[in-house]
């Protein structure tokens, strides 16, 4: 099930979708599981057990792939990651106890001073999802809570506040390019934020049959922003397949191996163990590593 070619040293990035809950309703969000019961984030003992299991994952991959992963960066994603301060604080405590590095992806809308301090003092990296800075586009995408559309100025302010506490933190911007924002120019926003990385994804057909774009349209978006080529990491659909280690809210590995049939899942990690669960999904270690190359904008 796995690709066995040897790859270079790298920290292992594990994406844990801690919850499906979100205050936005983006139409092409891929973090949808039908509101499952039993999210591990709700239970302290389950969080602890999952952290133990994740700590052992580099050894599993090193054995299976003749790789040399040395540590784990636990990337917290949602849903929206920063909805419940108490629960995130518990995850931070458990992760740090085991020496795991932390990062997260957020829409930024609910980040208050408590979260700013927690992030700045405990996270190596924080990524903000920004697909558009245009109100009507964000409304069409679903980046809206009640009547409040995503506010780019709040994100700029939040990033400045986090950097003021921890100037060394890595700031990322994640952008999904779809039919709704393919013609937009985000240069002013990116120029203000000056992130360390700008990850640009082509919308996945696994979650949306509408709003899809062609390879040419995706390339045009990249070329429009080529002055940021040094920080852009672009991913088309092929590069995203089997190249992420993802855990769903109830503790199963899942993979987007086949765009036409949704996701493939392992059995729950806490039931069958990390080695067995990981064996039940596809993972391409070379693709994982090559995702970190910079996009070629020539």
UniProtKB/Swiss-Prot annotation:
It catalyses: CTP + AH2 + S-adenosyl-L-methionine = 3'-deoxy-3',4'-didehydro-CTP + 5'-deoxyadenosine + L-methionine + A + H2O + H(+); UTP + AH2 + S-adenosyl-L-methionine = 3'-deoxy-3',4'-didehydro-UTP + 5'-deoxyadenosine + L-methionine + A + H2O + H(+). It comes from the Bacteria. [4Fe-4S] cluster binds at residues 22, 26, 29. PANTHER family: RADICAL S-ADENOSYL METHIONINE DOMAIN-CONTAINING PROTEIN 2, S-ADENOSYLMETHIONINE-DEPENDENT NUCLEOTIDE DEHYDRATASE RSAD2. Belongs to the radical SAM superfamily. Viperin family. How this protein allows bacteria to resist viruses that do not encode their own RNA polymerase (such as lambda, P1) is unknown. This is S-adenosylmethionine-dependent nucleotide dehydratase.
């Amino acid at each position: 099930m796995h690709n066995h070619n040897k790859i270079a040293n790298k920290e292992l990035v594990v994406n844990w979708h801690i919850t499906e809950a979100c205050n936005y309703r983006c139409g092409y969000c891929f973090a949808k599981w039908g509101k499952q019961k039993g999210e591990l984030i709700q239970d302290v003992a389950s969080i602890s057990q999952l952290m133990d299991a994740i700590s052992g994952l580099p050894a599993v991959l090193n054995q299976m792939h003749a790789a040399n992963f040395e540590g784990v960066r636990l990337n917290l994603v949602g849903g929206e990651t920063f909805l419940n301060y108490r629960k995130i604080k518990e995850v931070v405590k458990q992760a740090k106890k085991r020496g795991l590095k932390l990062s997260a992806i957020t829409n930024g809308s609910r980040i208050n001073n408590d979260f700013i301090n927690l992030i700045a003092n405990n996270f190596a990296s924080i990524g903000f999802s920004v697909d558009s800075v245009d109100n009507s586009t964000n409304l069409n995408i679903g980046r809206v809570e009640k009547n409040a559309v995503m506010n780019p100025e709040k994100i700029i302010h939040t990033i400045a506040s986090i950097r003021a506490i921890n100037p060394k933190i890595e700031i990322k911007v994640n952008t999904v390019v779809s039919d709704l924002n393919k013609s937009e120019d985000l240069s002013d926003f990116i120029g203000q934020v000056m992130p360390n990385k700008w990850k640009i994804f082509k919308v996945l057909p696994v979650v949306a049959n509408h709003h899809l774009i062609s390879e040419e349209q995706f390339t045009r978006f990249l070329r429009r922003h080529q002055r940021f080529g040094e920080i852009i990491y672009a991913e088309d659909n092929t590069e995203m397949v089997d190249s992420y280690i993802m855990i769903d809210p109830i503790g199963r590995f899942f993979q987007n191996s086949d765009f036409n049939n949704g996701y493939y899942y392992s059995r729950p990690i806490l039931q069958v163990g990390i080695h067995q669960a990981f064996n039940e999904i596809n993972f391409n270690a070379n693709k994982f590593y090559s995702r970190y190359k910079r996009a070629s904008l020539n």
